[in-house]
């Protein structure tokens, strides 16, 4: 951790290793193993900061081990992992998964649950400091109609009524199933059924179905951007109230919801066929059966059971097929018959699969020692299409045969890997290395000449051997064999202290190579090691033997790798038999949980058949997504977000949904609305009428604010020196015209320089001369070597285009448009040249210049200028210690700059400069907020909380949304640690402890919120020269005043 971060930490020296501290360490690091955390704290001698540093280094290895889940950040890509310091040598991250055994379901976030997890926290009923994350609150006094009005046929979101994001995820996934949607909307029963239903449960189920009908009707026909599910939720909540008012888990809520629907449909079914559940449409859609066969104490048994949501364990499995295989086969092999068929205690086979197949992933377990649930964050992959043939009873004989084949292949794979490991980890001592490389090193030693020989050959030879060593290690890693000896991981090499520190801060690959790398030799010993005396005959004999042995061993290694590859391919293709691909199920929805067991957020990814794309349903927000984003958020292993429920639909259901998607979705929804009963249609109409009333009232309120808003917009017009009367005119011009106006002084100078040509040869010759002279000037300017104090792109749009290799037609049209700008009406010469330039612009046809591409280039330059202005303003404010204002500018500069850098390195500004000062500003602001909070003065405390809620936490979440760097991650951990250090302080008032307990869940949960950070006021530079002079002044000030170098 850098000195800068250490200076910002400000925490106490140590805390007791009690249950509260372990809970805090779990939330900060994401590690759930209490024994592992306790060992870390003990090794750090009770120092919480040292323990967190070690744990953070251990945790940083995980993204590299699971690179398939997400793209690595810039600091992750260069190393396989980090070796722990000597103080933490006893920790083994691989042992984390062994602790998890029993799996329980995760609970919803609640004050009671927080109290169980953090005994020191006291929760007030009002939650004044937003201890609960209300992600739906993106509207407010200054919201626009677009924030709450539906756009076209886009699906609607669902309002979060206080920790009800799980309900939105479940209901949205069910609503997007046409069969289920129609079942709910067409639900009806004779009036006498309601009269004869006297039980409270029956009446409640009917009431819930009626509320769900109204909700689904609104989701079809509303003009709102999101709907309010309060009525249906109240019925659910009332059903779970008990004398102890305990919080129920999400899975139980979901099961109860489906049970109520089933019971409601059964009331209607009983009118025709009393007691016949097979006619229940919910059973037909969501329920299947499986056969359990096995042997218990020597006796065989067989039974058929019904299932709805099928539970699957996650721990110990890599993908969904492995989970299913583990669930279908339980028991151990009979060793006496190992050479014969494989015997299992119990096997399950699906005898009937439902059209909608739901898998419930058990990602929660109950920790008996802590007395609270914990979440399992391990990675689990699942496919978009899964073939269920291998789990069907009709495939039993074929699958049992393949399981025997699979067992033999895995045994063969194990033998081959063990053989290969003997080659790749050769030696009898604690440090072992690849045998081919060891022979190569000996060969290099033999052939090295004594002192006085050319040293470059020695260096070259050493580099070549290191390269081969890296390649060998990389291959062994790919094949799943360890590439590090245990002694290296334990740090027991007996090296000097400074070398041990170097090893602790290097990657395992670098540590493996460390003994083979030549250290910097002293001046008097500049030669490589070499034999003292060796005859030509001895050298030839040893060289011949070493080369022959090395070739033999390399051939053995290649043969082993080829055999492993063949066996691995056979394993991968074991179930690729066409006979086992007749029952496909397609992924319909993925329900995701983010956070810990007792606190978190839920959302859903649902495949939209009409649009042929994935949509993300996150409370009121419904946005277009991708399979790549779904993988990152759902597979787990990297962050604390992972799927907890998968919903697959059969091929038949998928075809029905796809068939409906052939036409317009809005047309399909309209047809369903027209088919609704009259009372539901009237309900939709009334809600839409209320929306129009609300819109009219909103417009009346906004009309009172128009004068002040207009004057404000004129005062802060972007990027130009226009007077207020010209603001409206500027908004109507294209960006290219705006850029021409910005450069009008330079264009006017070019016209003035062509005055002689104008007098001698006329207007066209003057335009041609001025055009070529200006082009030559800008071209040379674009080729100048940039300096930290000078960015030529700020001077002119064409410099930006030329440095980014814009098409020549776009460059020429842009420059011609500069001379056609009507703002050049200074004199007769300028007006004449302007008219000729305009005529030439009209002659350029659409085939010569792609106007869409032309527009995009000018949009990029406009965004570049905006980023530059925001960056300069942020840096100036930072130097003036106005950290609140500075941070907002820097955050917006980074977000816009990221968009530009995706198109090319020269499209945006120096990203490292923005991230450095954004980080420094955030740390300074956190220091200010925390100091205000502990001041015990109410006004200062309120201000500190306001800074934390409105700036620091939103900015932390925005940083997490991008590829976060190691420095940013360390900074976030430092800020969290500072606030955690205030827990349990005796000198802090009890009311402050309550407020702190309410703030910490949002601060510690690194999940992505729907963050709406108000954009800062726009700043207008008077001219390009003004912008360049400000840039030079700020950069000169930074480099003179700061010792931090920007890489």
From Swiss-Prot:
EC id: 3.4.19.12
Gene that specifies this protein: USP28
Pfam families: UCH (PF00443), USP_UIM_N (PF21909)
GO cellular component, one term: nucleus
UniProt keyword annotations, A-Z: DNA damage, DNA repair, Hydrolase, Nucleus, Protease, Thiol protease, Ubl conjugation pathway
InterPro entries: Papain-like_cys_pep_sf, Peptidase_C19_UCH, UBA-like_sf, UBP14-like, USP25/28_UIM, USP_CS, USP_dom
Enzyme's top EC category: hydrolase
Domain UIM: 94-113
GO biological process terms held by the UniProt record: cell population proliferation; DNA damage checkpoint signaling; DNA repair; intrinsic apoptotic signaling pathway in response to DNA damage by p53 class mediator; proteasome-mediated ubiquitin-dependent protein catabolic process; protein deubiquitination; regulation of protein stability; response to ionizing radiation
SUPFAM superfamilies per UniProt: Cysteine proteinases, UBA-like
Composition skew (Polar residues), residue ranges: 461-486, 504-516, 705-717
Annotated spans, Disordered: 60-95, 110-138, 461-528, 694-735
Record keyword Thylakoid present: no
Reaction(s) the record says it catalyses: Thiol-dependent hydrolysis of ester, thioester, amide, peptide and isopeptide bonds formed by the C-terminal Gly of ubiquitin (a 76-residue protein attached to proteins as an intracellular targeting signal)
Name by which UniProt lists this protein: Ubiquitin carboxyl-terminal hydrolase 28
PANTHER family in the record: UBIQUITIN CARBOXYL-TERMINAL HYDROLASE, UBIQUITIN CARBOXYL-TERMINAL HYDROLASE 2-RELATED
Ranges where the USP domain occurs: 156-651
Family: Belongs to the peptidase C19 family. USP28 subfamily.
């Amino acid at each position: 951790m850098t000195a800068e971060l250490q200076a910002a930490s400000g925490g106490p020296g140590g805390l007791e290793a009690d249950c509260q501290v372990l809970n805090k360490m779990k939330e900060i690091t994401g590690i759930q193993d209490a024994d592992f955390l306790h060992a870390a704290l003990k090794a750090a001698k009770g120092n919480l900061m040292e323990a967190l540093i070690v744990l953070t280094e251990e945790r940083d290895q995980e993204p590299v081990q699971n690179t398939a889940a997400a793209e690595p950040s810039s600091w992750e890509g260069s190393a396989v992992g980090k070796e722990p310091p000597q103080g933490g040598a006893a920790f083994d991250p691989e042992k984390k998964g062994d602790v998890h055994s029993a799996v329980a379901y995760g609970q919803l976030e609640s004050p009671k649950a927080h109290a169980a997890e953090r005994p020191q926290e006291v929760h007030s009923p009002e939650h004044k400091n937003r201890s609960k994350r209300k992600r739906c609150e993106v509207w407010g006094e200054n919201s626009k109609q677009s924030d709450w009005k539906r756009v076209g046929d886009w699906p609607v979101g669902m309002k979060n009524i206080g920790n009800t994001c799980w309900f939105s995820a479940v209901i949205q996934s069910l609503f997007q199933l046409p069969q289920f949607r129609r079942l709910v909307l067409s639900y009806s029963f004779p009036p006498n059924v309601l009269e004869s239903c006297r039980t409270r449960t029956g009446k409640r189920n009917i009431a819930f179905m009626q509320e769900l009908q109204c909700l689904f009707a609104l989701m079809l026909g509303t003009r709102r951007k999101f709907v309010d599910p309060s009525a249906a939720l109240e019925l659910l909540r009332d059903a779970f109230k008990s004398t102890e008012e305990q919080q129920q888990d999400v899975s139980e809520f979901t099961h109860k919801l489906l049970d109520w629907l089933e019971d409601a449909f059964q009331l209607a079914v009983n009118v025709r066929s009393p007691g016949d559940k097979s006619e229940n449409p919910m059973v037909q859609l969501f329920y299947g059966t499986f056969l359990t066969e096995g042997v218990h104490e020597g006796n065989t048994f067989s039974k058929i059971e019904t299932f709805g949501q099928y539970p699957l364990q996650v721990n110990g499995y890599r993908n969904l097929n492995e989970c299913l295989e583990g669930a279908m086969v339980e028991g151990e092999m009979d060793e006496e018959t190992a050479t014969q068929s494989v015997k299992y205690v119990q096997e399950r086979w699906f005898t009937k699969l439902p059209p909608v197949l739901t898998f419930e992933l058990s990602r929660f377990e109950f920790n008996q020692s802590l007395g609270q649930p914990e979440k399992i964050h391990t990675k689990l992959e699942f496919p978009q299409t899964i073939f269920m043939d291998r789990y069907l009873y009709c495939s039993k004989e074929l699958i049992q045969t393949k399981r025997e084949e699979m067992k033999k292949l895995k045994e063969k794979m194990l033998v081959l890997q063990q053989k290969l490991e003997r080659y790749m980890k050769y030696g009898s001592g604690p440090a072992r290395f690849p045998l081919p490389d060891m022979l190569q090193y000996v060969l290099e030693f033999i052939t090295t000449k004594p002192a006085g020989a050319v040293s470059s050959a020695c260096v070259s030879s050493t580099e070549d051997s290191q390269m081969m060593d890296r390649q060998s290690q990389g291959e062994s890693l790919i094949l799943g064999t360890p590439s590090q000896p245990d002694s290296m991981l334990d740090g027991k090499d007996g090296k000097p202290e400074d070398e041990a520190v170097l090893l602790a801060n290097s990657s395992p690959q670098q540590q493996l190579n460390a003994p083979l790398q030549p250290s910097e030799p002293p001046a008097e010993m500049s030669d490589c090691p070499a034999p003292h005396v060796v005859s030509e005959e001895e050298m030839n004999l040893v060289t011949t033997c070493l080369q022959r042995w090395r070739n033999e061993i390399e051939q053995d290694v290649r043969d082993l790798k080829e055999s492993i590859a063949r066996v691995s391919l056979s394993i991968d293709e074991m179930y690729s038999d066409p006979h086992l691909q007749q029952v496909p199920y397609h992924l319909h929805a993925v329900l995701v949980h983010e956070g810990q067991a007792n606190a978190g957020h839920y959302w859903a990814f649902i495949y939209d058949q009409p649009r042929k794309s994935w949509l993300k349903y996150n409370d009121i927000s419904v946005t277009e997504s991708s399979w790549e984003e779904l993988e990152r958020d759902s597979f787990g292993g990297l962050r604390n977000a992972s799927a907890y429920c998968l919903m697959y639909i059969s091929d038949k259901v998928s075809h029905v949904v796809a068939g409906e998607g052939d036409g317009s979705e809005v047309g399909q929804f309209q047809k369903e609305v027209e088919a609704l009963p009259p009372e539901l249609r009237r309900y939709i109409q009334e809600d839409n009428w209320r929306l129009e009333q609300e819109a009219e009232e909103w417009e009346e309120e906004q009309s009172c604010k128009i004068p002040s808003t207009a004057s404000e917009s004129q005062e802060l017009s972007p990027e130009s020196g226009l007077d207020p009367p010209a603001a409206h005119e500027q908004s109507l011009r294209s960006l290219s015209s705006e850029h021409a106006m910005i450069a009008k002084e330079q264009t006017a100078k070019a016209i003035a320089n062509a005055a002689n040509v104008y007098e001698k040869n006329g207007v066209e010759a003057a335009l041609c001369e001025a055009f070529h002279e200006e082009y030559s000037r800008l071209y040379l300017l674009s080729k100048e070597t940039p300096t930290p104090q000078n960015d030529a792109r700020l001077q002119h749009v064409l410099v930006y285009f030329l440095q980014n290799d814009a098409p020549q037609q776009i460059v020429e049209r842009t420059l011609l448009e500069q001379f056609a700008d009507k703002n050049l009406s200074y004199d007769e010469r300028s007006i004449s040249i302007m008219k000729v330039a305009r005529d030439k612009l009209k002659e350029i046809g659409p085939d010569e210049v792609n106007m869409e591409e032309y527009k995009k280039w000018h949009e990029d330059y406009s965004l570049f200028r905006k980023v530059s202005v925001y960056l300069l303003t942020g840096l100036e404010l930072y130097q003036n210690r106005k950290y609140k204002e500075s941070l907002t500018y820097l955050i917006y500069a980074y977000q816009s700059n990221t968009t530009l850098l995706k198109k090319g390195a020269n499209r945006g500004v120096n990203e490292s400069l923005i991230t450095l000062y954004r980080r420094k500003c955030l740390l300074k602001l956190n220091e200010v907020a925390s100091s205000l909070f502990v001041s015990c003065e109410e006004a200062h405390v309120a201000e500190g909380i306001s800074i934390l809620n409105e700036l620091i936490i939103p900015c932390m979440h925005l940083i997490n949304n991008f590829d976060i760097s190691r420095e940013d991650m360390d900074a976030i951990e430092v800020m969290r640690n500072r606030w955690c250090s205030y827990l349990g302080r005796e000198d802090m008032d009890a009311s402050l402890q309550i407020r702190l307990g309410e703030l910490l869940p949002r601060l510690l949960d690194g999940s992505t919120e729907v963050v709406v950070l108000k954009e800062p006021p726009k700043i207008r530079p008077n001219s390009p020269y003004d912008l360049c002079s400000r840039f030079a002044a700020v950069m000169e000030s930074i480099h003179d005043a700061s010792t931090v170098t920007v890489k």
